[in-house]
Amino acid sequence: MNKKIYLLPLLLLALIFVSCEETKEAGKYDNWKARGEMFIDSIAAEAAAQTEQTPIAERIYSVLDQVNRNYIYYKKNIDYPPTSNVSPLYTDSVVTNYRMSYFNGDIVQQTFTGKDPDGFSKPVGFTVDKVISGWTWALQQMKVGERWTLYIPWKSGYGSATGPSGDLQPYSTLVYDVQL
């Protein structure tokens, strides 16, 4: 009987230690690649579900990345209509304002702050064929003056790399706010 009295407190003590074990919280970038792919899949499903009655401001368009064989999705900002009927060619130089963010909304790079580009913006110039393939294929569809939101899968972005300056998460699905 005496042994049974000691067993109960020992059992309770063991349960307390087991129940106090810390659980690991999910990190901000856990399952990053899979989450990014699910985000693009949701954009693709939204694009596929569109009808002729879908308002122009809500339409999602797509262009095939001829290099990586996946689709780049984009929305046109109707508040920024084209100022010209000209679209850049593969070897053309362009000037853009842009904001690059992860699919979770974290801003990574930008040439403007605030909601819209303004006189304090610092647009950048580059050759269309010298940027990530997602940009290359989307830019060739844009007209001068337009502003689009691009949804770029990781394969058409920086892939498994961390970007030119090493500050990107590998396998990042990217969202760009671009004005040509």
Can you say where each PLM-predicted feature lies in the sequence?
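Extreme N-terminal targeting and regulatory segments of eukaryotic proteins
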Residues: L12-L13, K24
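Sec-dependent N-terminal signal peptides
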Residues: Y6-L12
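Cross-family detector of peptidyl-prolyl cis-trans isomerase
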Residues: N2-I5, C20-L180
